[in-house]
Amino acid sequence: MEKPKYNRIVLKLSGEALAGEQGNGINPTVIQSIAKQVKEIAELDVEVAVVVGGGNLWRGKTGSDLGMDRATADYMGMLATVMNSLALQDSLETLGIQSRVQTSIEMRQVAEPYIRRKAIRHLEKKRVVIFAAGTGNPYFSTDTTAALRAAEIEADVILMAKNNVDGVYNADPRTDETAVKYEKLSYLDVLKDGLAVMDSTASSLCMDNDIPLIVFSIMEEGNIKRAVLGEQIGTIVRGK
């Protein structure tokens, strides 16, 4: 069996990653592909926690920009992440991978409430744990959720899977042909240069708790496994 570099990971999936090329909604083919990749690493005895965004269904900031109360818009976004999490859970269990959804906002008919010790126990039993509903508080992104949960469960790394870029660049590679991709960065570089990796709250939390971050493309099948095995893909962010 191949030996993974990391034993306990947090996989951060953007909502857009679940939409695939259609841009919004949940693409069943894409979510099945992601579930198969998660199965690959679960079979290496890696403990897998997942944080899913909700941008394929709703963005709190968009609602706020249109005049909605920001807190209400953010709560709607949290509910969108629950829908995505349940879809991912279903795909995983179709493949025979036991999983649990834990929500920051209680909805016991749908999922377990988030309890740190229980989440760790699930991971130790090799169940995939999907953290839904963000932090349970408005004004905090799902990037911050990933950083917070990674600190709480003492994860070895955060794998940030992107659907539109394969790492961190000094400019937007979709609009600037001269954009240069970084292989390694520090969190101070990210904060100082305002690089679009994750928001500053999440970056600070990762830096303060010394949690490495790997940013890579989800669109190339097998990349999650490559990252877990320690292959050089995407961009790694760590330290001060």
From Swiss-Prot:
Its main location: cytoplasm. It holds the Pfam family AA_kinase. It catalyses: UMP + ATP = UDP + ADP. The keyword RNA-binding does not apply. It is an enzyme of class 2 (transferase). Keywords: Allosteric enzyme, ATP-binding, Cytoplasm, Kinase, Nucleotide-binding, Pyrimidine biosynthesis, Transferase. UMP binds at G54, D74, T135, G136, N137, P138, Y139, F140, S141, T142. Allosterically activated by GTP. Inhibited by UTP. GO terms for cellular component: cytoplasm. SUPFAM superfamilies: Carbamate kinase-like. Pathway: Pyrimidine metabolism; CTP biosynthesis via de novo pathway; UDP from UMP (UMPK route): step 1/1. Its EC number is 2.7.4.22. Residues 20-25 are annotated as: Involved in allosteric activation by GTP. ATP binds at K12, L13, S14, G15, G55, R59, N163, Y169, D172. It is found in: Cytoplasm. GO terms for molecular function: ATP binding; UMP kinase activity. GO terms for biological process: 'de novo' CTP biosynthetic process; UDP biosynthetic process. InterPro entries: AceGlu_kinase-like_sf, Asp/Glu/Uridylate_kinase, Uridylate_kinase, Uridylate_kinase_bac. Belongs to the UMP kinase family. Catalyzes the reversible phosphorylation of UMP to UDP. PANTHER family: URIDYLATE KINASE, URIDYLATE KINASE PUMPKIN, CHLOROPLASTIC. Homohexamer. This is Uridylate kinase. The gene is pyrH.
